[in-house]
UniProtKB/Swiss-Prot annotation:
Glycans are attached at N27. Disulfide bonds join C119-C201. This is Olfactory receptor 7E178. Residues 1-47, 101-119, 186-218, 288-293 are extracellular. The gene is Or7e178. CDD domains: 7tmA_OR7-like.
């Protein structure tokens, strides 16, 4: 039987904001599910969206798994740079798999409901792998900094123990951020609506729907944002400031070009990841349409992980040669 709160939310979805009083809270059961907005209500558009996102998901899986397989199977790529790249590919696959399969199933079944526990789980993994992506990009920037600014000590500094420690710390910090965020959301007992204006359980959307005072929660969220966003970006900026300063001091144009080319792929991925994320944030702040914001967020949740393998493979001769060797072994 549907509880009173769920019934009221169902009857007044999208046009009524309702929060229980202190007395009513005692007789109201927590909501059992949310409803995701999706990208379009046009039924004729659903098969196209299904085919498009299924194709993008398969390309993302195949591209990133191919990078992982290539790096792990070729001894020429057993270096710190490619170690971080394979971990980034694994994080990208996990990041996309957090949201995209659910959206594909929703399009096919025309059912956009997600359980309360399912929503929290999706949100936790979204924060975990999103933060992990960010921290791994920072570790890769540090690797490039050591390679260009301290080339004679590169092998000594970037030893396997340090590389493993950097990845371990990235996972540990990401878990901390995810659990800290979860602890904030679990305190939100009642919501103004069960409709989430997104195609997945976006953390900011849940906070916007909360009935309780979210001042303290917002402070915690800003702290989480600083850990997962500001600190990694600061580390990347500092690394590239040192890299550019070192390159400009090189006497030969050939040396400058070679040094810049080793950073080209990573810098492209950094600009794509943070640039699209910032673009989505700014567009959602300016646009009054939640659906436009949801469509824009596809760029960093789906498109960026899909393009990363192509960016690294197209600009990297070592990856290309390793892929050809792997292909010849397979055939």
């Amino acid at each position: 039987m549907m509880d009173r709160y769920s019934f009221i939310m169902h009857q007044h979805r999208d046009d009524t904001v309702w929060c229980p009083s202190k007395i009513e809270e005692q007789n109201i059961t927590r909501i059992s599910e949310f409803h995701l907005m999706g990208l379009s209500d046009d039924l004729q558009l659903q098969p196209i969206l299904f085919g498009l996102f299924l194709s993008m998901y398969l390309v993302t899986l195949l591209g990133n798994l191919l990078i992982i397989l290539t790096v792990s199977s070729d001894s020429h790529l057993h270096s710190p740079m490619y170690f971080f790249l394979s971990n980034l590919s694994l994080a990208d696959v996990s990041f996309t798999s957090t949201t995209l399969p659910k959206m594909i199933v929703d399009i096919q079944t025309h059912n956009r409901a997600i359980s309360y526990s399912g929503c929290l789980t999706q949100m936790s993994f979204f924060m975990l792998f999103g933060c992990l992506d960010s921290l791994l990009l920072t570790a890769m920037a540090y690797d490039r900094f050591v390679a260009i600014c301290h080339p004679l000590h590169y092998q000594f500094i970037m030893n396997p123990r340090l590389c493993g420690l950097l990845v371990f710390l990235s996972v540990l910090i990401s878990l901390f951020v995810s659990q800290l965020h979860n602890s904030v959301v679990l305190q939100l007992t009642y919501f103004k609506s069960v409709d989430i204006s997104h195609f997945f359980c976006d953390p900011s959307q849940l906070l916007n729907l909360a009935c309780s005072d979210t001042f303290t929660n917002n402070i915690v969220m800003y702290f989480v944002g600083a850990i997962s966003g500001f600190l990694p970006i600061s580390g990347i900026f500092f690394s590239y400031y040192k890299i550019v300063s070192s390159i400009l001091r090189m006497p030969s144009p050939g040396g400058k070009y070679k040094a810049f080319s080793t950073c080209g792929s990573h810098l492209s991925v950094v600009c794509l990841f943070y640039g699209t994320g910032l673009g989505v944030y700014l567009s959602s702040a300016v646009s009054l349409s939640p659906r436009k914001g949801a469509v824009a967020s596809i760029v960093y949740t789906v498109v960026t992980p899909m393009l990363n393998p192509f960016i690294y493979s197209l600009r990297n001769q070592d990856i290309k040669r390793a892929m050809w060797r792997l292909l010849r072994k397979t055939v």
